[in-house]
C-alpha cells in the first residue's frame, strides 16, 4: 500500500529482465496501456485507485513476467457487475493477444462460463467433473454439477431445480468413498461410502468420477 503503481510494476521487470532507466519506464507504460490505464497512473498509490483499477494493475503486474500460465483466483470477487464485465473483457482480450493460458478459480458460475474453455468442478477439494465449458453447463454429468447448476437462480421463481442435494453440512471430506456421498441425491448404496468412484468419459466429452454409469446418469437427467 506504500508503493506507487510504478514501483509495483517495476519489481517483476527488474527481477526477471534486469531492466532499469528509460527501458524500465517504457515497459511500465506499455503494461499500463495493455490494461487500458494511462501513464499518469504511475505516480498513484493503491488507496487512490478504484476496485477495478486495482485489478487492472494486478493484471499488469501478472503479465509483466511474460508468463505462459496465470493463476486467477477470484479476480472478480467484491467488484460490481459492470466492473466485473470490464475486467473479464480485458482478460479475454489479453488472452487472445498474448496467447496466455489462465487457470481461473471462481465460485461465480456465470463468470466461469464467460471466461473458460474447459471447466473442472470440485467438491470438498476433489475433482468431480471435467469437460469443455459449454458441455459441462448444457449437459452436466456428475450429480454435484447437476445440483450446482440447478441452484442458480432462474428468471422464473416457479421453476424448481430437477435435483436437490441433501441438506447436510459437511465440515470435511469423508475418509473413504465418494466426496459427495453425504449429500448426493443419486446415491446407490454402500459402494459410495467405501470406494473412490472411477473416472468415466461420456459421449459429450465430459469426464466424471461416479459409481453410476455415465450414460445411465444422462438418462436420469432427461
Predicted regions located by residue number:
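Q-loop/switch helix immediately C-terminal to the Walker
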Residues: 1-14
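Conserved ABC ATPase "signature" region
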Residues: 22-40, 149
Amino acid at each position: 500500500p506504500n508503493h506507487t503503481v510504478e514501483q509495483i510494476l517495476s519489481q517483476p521487470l527488474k527481477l526477471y529482465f534486469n531492466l532499469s532507466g528509460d527501458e524500465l519506464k517504457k515497459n511500465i507504460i506499455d503494461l499500463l496501456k495493455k490494461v487500458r490505464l494511462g501513464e499518469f497512473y504511475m505516480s498513484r498509490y493503491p488507496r487512490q485507485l478504484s476496485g477495478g483499477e486495482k485489478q487492472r494493475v494486478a493484471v499488469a503486474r501478472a503479465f509483466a513476467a511474460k508468463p505462459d500460465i496465470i493463476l486467477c483466483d477470484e479476480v472478480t470477487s467484491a467488484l460490481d457487475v459492470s466492473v466485473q464485465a470490464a475486467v473479464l473483457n480485458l482478460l479475454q482480450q489479453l488472452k487472445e493477444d498474448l496467447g496466455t493460458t489462465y487457470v481461473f478459480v471462481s465460485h461465480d458460475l456465470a463468470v466461469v462460463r464467460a471466461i473458460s474453455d474447459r471447466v473442472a468442478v470440485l467438491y470438498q477439494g476433489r475433482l468431480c467433473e471435467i469437460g469443455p465449458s459449454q458441455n459441462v453447463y448444457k449437459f452436466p454429468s456428475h450429480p454435484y454439477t447437476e445440483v450446482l447448476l440447478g441452484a442458480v437462480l432462474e428468471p422464473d421463481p416457479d421453476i424448481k431445480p430437477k435435483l436437490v442435494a441433501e441438506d447436510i453440512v459437511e465440515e470435511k471430506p469423508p475418509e473413504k468413498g465418494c466426496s459427495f456421498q453425504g449429500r448426493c441425491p443419486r446415491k446407490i448404496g454402500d459402494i459410495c461410502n467405501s470406494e473412490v468412484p472411477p473416472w468415466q468419459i461420456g459421449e459429450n466429452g465430459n469426464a466424471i468420477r461416479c459409481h453410476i454409469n455415465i450414460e445411465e446418469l444422462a438418462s436420469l437427467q432427461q
